[in-house]
Amino acid sequence: MLDSFKENEALRKYLFSGHFGLEKENIRVTSDGKLALTPHPAIFGPKEDNPYIKTDFSESQIEMITPVTDSIDAVYEWLENLHNIVSLRAENELLWPSSNPPILPAEEDIPIAEYKTPDSPDRKYREHLAKGYGKKIQLLSGIHYNFSFPEALIDGLYAEISHPNESKRDFKNRLYLKVAKYFMKNRWLLIYLTGASPVYLADFTKTNSEEVLNDGSKALHRGISLRNSNAGYKNKESLFVDYNSFDAYISSISNYIEAGKIESMREFYNPIRLKNAHTDQTVESLAKHGVEYLEIRSIDLNPLEPNGISKDELIFIHLFLIKGLLSEDRELCANNQQLADENENNIALNGLAQPAIKNCDNEEMSLADAGLLELDKMSDFIQSLIPNDNHFQAIIEKQKERLLHPEKTIAAQVQAQSAKEGYVEFHLNQAKTYMEETEALAYKLVGAEDMELSTQIIWKDAIARGIKVDVLDRAENFLRFQKGDHVEYVKQASKTSKDNYVSVLMMENKVVTKLVLAEHGIRVPFGDSFSDQALALEAFSLFEDKQIVVKPKSTNYGWGISIFKNKFTLEDYQEALNIAFSYDSSVIIEEFIPGDEFRFLVINDKVEAVLKRVPANVTGDGIHTVRQLVEEKNTDPLRGTDHLKPLEKIRTGPEETLMLSMQNLSWDSIPKAEEIIYLRENSNVSTGGDSIDYTEEMDDYFKEIAIRATQVLDAKICGVDIIVPRETIDRDKHAIIELNFNPAMHMHCFPYQGEKKKIGDKILDFLFE
């Protein structure tokens, strides 16, 4: 078969691609490493309805399922995002990073997963497993790796090497059977290289190859993977199926079901299973539709990786499957399966001692030699098909290092750290470290960092609920959300089907906004608008002795605004006009209202968040210049540009320069220690300001004003900016200075100070409930 790829460049390009899907199980634990007995987090909804986040056997055993993707990069991004979403939503709990369980309660207190009804087929199946195998063993967790070859690859091979009169369906079945046979024979190598469960608690199980560690936990003596050993999660007896043909494979599984050895194909716990994409996962469905993908079930959670597996491990498993496709198709009889099982168990229990491997002729070869033989073959076919590759070869070289140096295996490192820190402490420390890393980047959706932060937030919140998300226009942050038959289109996180078009037009035009609000008795600053810069300049005498604001008529995010609270010159006024007219063809000059500026986020006639916005500023140290202080403050990892991070970097543009000049300062001025220098007069977070949550502290009087303003304009998702007087006695001197039809949500979700609000959830509630 290798020759087919050497001679056919069009076919060769498909060999190293494919379709990938991952399923990952983690136990939810308390901060002291005990099984969490809390219900599955409600935000994820019923397990039956969420395609991404479910439970495995136990209510405490969360399962993350990626959609099918066309690359390992994409499936890994999905896995990382799901892991982060689940970690952040499992409040006050951690995700246990080991395949082997944490501290468990009594058997009868381990909760089986709950479903909508007590007689749910999923619930009944789990009750059957609990009765037949016990609950504790069900808590062994791992990763399932789902893979299929590209259809174009199968079509090309079918045209070149299919048997006479063989249908494409039969050819496809035969192809996947061949790969499965290779996997079954050589899975010992994968277990040696990826196994990561050599340590376990003393009361979990007992093996014939164990030693007691200092903390009382147990470790397999020179072992690799408890989960993949005979003491792991296996069928009660070995089930050898017939791999000679697809029909024989189906018949042998059917016979085991009829004999009562297993209840259904779901209970066929082979390390690799032939599957199709139909939800009816029965042997009859597989026989009818044929093989569509392979499910690899023997991968341990890697406690050394935040997401339980590395991207290079995923790539290596892919190469392993390609090797199976290119290998000679050999018989896998019951005797050979018995030998393969023995190799698997021997490596799982004693792999670090590097026991000999038996081939199908019952001949022995050292583990290192047998492993290097397979890895060299991988290296050879990669070299012959993609001679300029470096990445794949580097991954294979790393596996060779693990064969030659057992101490470099994942299992050896896990065992060493567990012996040093204790089984529970080591895995708890890993879980806490990963949680801290997740929390530090809680605002981010991996793979969507180029999109607005508010879009990333609502996208993540949609995934948590099992809502399907399609990107319609990446540059425009335009998404489609779908839950069942319900579809919603959302742009920039807050432009939705609930918007009234004329309301948007009114809010976009600040003159119209003020006029309509004033007509309804809502206080707004008085002022004038100008479309001619020369006329605006001539009006200087009307404003020179007043406190004023100069701003574009139709802009957002606080851009182009200048505020004069003190005496200003004609030159200052002219520069403010230049700035404002650079953003719009019309500007507004209005009175300055003293007080503090607050953003009220109103969703469907309810104030969901209130934020105090402090203008962009730096604090002096008596040593550094203003410019240097800005540069230092901008190094905060939470500050970015274009709304890609929770806080915006402070700019050094004309607005900031003007503000400094009004204070008789320049960029080279050195402020005194603890002296606060403001770089902007307006307090918009989008111009580098700091955000402080005030939702609970804000007087309901002003919340009602914000709601009334949105009702006047019939705005359903709206940011209302209100200047609130500092003295309660002056509260009637407030003023609404702006209504925003596309309010940013990220500053409420990740404020500089104060409580984080789940605004994405609030918008999704509004759209879908």
Curated annotation (Swiss-Prot):
UniProt keyword list: ATP-binding, Glutathione biosynthesis, Ligase, Magnesium, Manganese, Metal-binding, Multifunctional enzyme, Nucleotide-binding
Pathway terms, separated by semicolons: Sulfur metabolism; glutathione biosynthesis; glutathione from L-cysteine and L-glutamate: step 1/2; Sulfur metabolism; glutathione biosynthesis; glutathione from L-cysteine and L-glutamate: step 2/2
Residues annotated as domain ATP-grasp: 514-768
Family per similarity comment: In the N-terminal section; belongs to the glutamate--cysteine ligase type 1 family. Type 2 subfamily.
The UniProt record lists the keyword Hydrolase: no
Assigned EC number: 6.3.2.2, 6.3.2.3
Positions contributing to Mg(2+) 2 binding: E738, N740
Cofactor: Mg(2+); Mn(2+)
Binding positions (Mn(2+) 1): D721, E738
Record InterPro entries: ATP-grasp (IPR011761), ATP_grasp_subdomain_1 (IPR013815), Gln_synth/guanido_kin_cat_dom (IPR014746), Glu_cys_ligase (IPR007370), Glut_biosynth (IPR006335), Glut_cys_ligase (IPR006334), GshAB_ATP-grasp (IPR040657), PRibGlycinamid_synth_ATP-grasp (IPR020561)
Start and end residues of each stretch annotated as Glutamate--cysteine ligase: 1-347
Cited function: Synthesizes glutathione from L-glutamate and L-cysteine via gamma-L-glutamyl-L-cysteine.
Gene: gshAB
Cofactor note: Binds 2 magnesium or manganese ions per subunit.
Matching HAMAP family: Glut_biosynth
Top-level taxon: Bacteria
UniProt name for this protein: Glutathione biosynthesis bifunctional protein GshAB
Binding site residues for ATP: 541-599
GO molecular function list: ATP binding; glutamate-cysteine ligase activity; glutathione synthase activity; metal ion binding
Top-level class of the enzyme under EC nomenclature: ligase
Binding site for Mg(2+) 1: D721, E738
Reactions catalysed, as given in the entry: L-cysteine + L-glutamate + ATP = gamma-L-glutamyl-L-cysteine + ADP + phosphate + H(+); gamma-L-glutamyl-L-cysteine + glycine + ATP = glutathione + ADP + phosphate + H(+)
